[in-house]
Swiss-Prot record:
<comment type="similarity">
    <text>Belongs to the UPF0473 family.</text>
</comment>
<protein>
    <recommendedName>
        <fullName>UPF0473 protein CLK_1946</fullName>
    </recommendedName>
</protein>
<dbReference type="Pfam" id="PF06949">
    <property type="entry name" value="DUF1292"/>
</dbReference>
<dbReference type="InterPro" id="IPR009711">
    <property type="entry name" value="UPF0473"/>
</dbReference>
Amino acid sequence: MDNNVDTITLTDEEGKKTEFEVITKLDIEDKEYVVVVPKDEEVDEAIALRIDNNDNGEEVLVPVEEDEEFNMVAEAYELLFSEEQ
């Protein structure tokens, strides 16, 4: 995924499209992640997505659902933003 992407549009299981603002991209243990927030909604909660490749070699975004993996991404995110302040 290009590091200069500011927004992405994701489609849910019901076909509803939602635009997300990309907060940051993280490289952790040879995997890539993006942290996003819904662009037009007032929410304080970010969503962590892992960048994987499908069978055709195309990049796909997969929700981080495993607690251990999510905690690793959250810790890296918090460390990154605490250093910027």
